[in-house]
UniProtKB/Swiss-Prot annotation:
The gene is panD. The lineage of its organism: Bacteria, Bacillati, Actinomycetota, Actinomycetes, Micrococcales. This is Aspartate 1-decarboxylase. It comes from Kocuria rhizophila (strain ATCC 9341 / DSM 348 / NBRC 103217 / DC2201). Binds 1 pyruvoyl group covalently per subunit. The keyword Disulfide bond does not apply. Belongs to the PanD family.
Amino acid sequence: MLRTMFTGKIHRATVTQADLHYVGSVTVDQDLLDAAGILPGELVAVVDVTNGARLETYTIAGERGSGVLGINGAAAHLVHPGDLVILIAYGLMDTAEAQTYEPRVVHVDERNRIVALGSDPADAVVGDVVRPPHAREHGRAREDAATTRA
């Protein structure tokens, strides 16, 4: 059986532009894509922290070091410049790989510059949100799940 697992995310990035008349997609600084392990053309979920909108689209590589995060096409009706968003990529993997896979988590500042890298999807950085009170450390949760199945 294949499982759909979280593989990488860019956390709380700021939307820098929106173009309703573009053909679609989300344009993302190539440095951020690389750090999150997301490829150009890859399916991503865009979760708007500002207004709660959630959509799926594909990525287009933006200029390295630019901090660009542009919402293109019809999604520009839902997500606007200045909104905080989370870009999330998922991948299919078998159970054995899913139990050991280390996702890539990229935390950015208000200008979409990388401030922290990690693999725990529940970790927060100083000045950001807090860790959910009942969240277990990512590696520990995997160990507990493996023990339960054994």
